[in-house]
Amino acid sequence: MILGMLALGTAMETTGAAHLIASGLTGAVGHFGPAVTLSVTYLVATVLTELISNNAVAVLLTPIAFEIAATMGVDARPFAVAVMFGCAASFATPIGHQTNTYVFGAGGYRFSDFPKIGAPLNILLWIVASILIPIFWPFVPKP
């Protein structure tokens, strides 16, 4: 699956699909500024990670994150970090990360057990990341 996503990520970059998606996202929320766009980028990453593998989401969204930054004329690092942190925040389903799948089966949990604890944690990390990422990785790097 990851190999297929690598090919898809490369194809998105080569064909301009990443630019098209980035332009759509920045057109929708870019007028609110880079902080809101970063927050939405993180949110997209964490939601997609709950549905497919976190590695696949990282491969798919990283080229889009770079295009978003380029479209907005800001440093790409905060957007790349938002994608990586969002992909790592897979707590609301047993699908997004291998460890969740292991404990799902071995622990005898139900699917509905994951969102009860994981969704509030995802929301908390979304808020914290949206605040702290621009502090540690500014949109305009210091000279």
Where are these regions (language model features)?
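Small-residue-rich segments of transmembrane alpha-helices in multi-pass membrane proteins
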Residues: M1-A11, P63-G73, I117, W126
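Core transmembrane alpha-helical segments of multi-pass membrane transporters/permeases
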Residues: M1-L20, A35-V47, L51
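Hydrophobic, well-ordered secondary-structure elements that form the walls
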Residues: L8, I21, S53, A65, ...
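Short helix-coil transition sites and intra-membrane helix breaks within transmembrane domains
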Residues: T10-A18, V47-L60, A89-Q98
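Alpha-helical membrane-inserting segments
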Residues: M12, V44, L48, I52, ...
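Membrane-interface helix termini and inter-helical loops of multi-pass transporters
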Residues: E13-V29, P138-P143
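Hydrophobic alpha-helical transmembrane segments of multi-pass integral membrane proteins
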Residues: H31-I68, M72, A76, A80, ...
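Juxtamembrane and boundary regions of transmembrane helices in multi-pass small-molecule transporters
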Residues: M84-P143
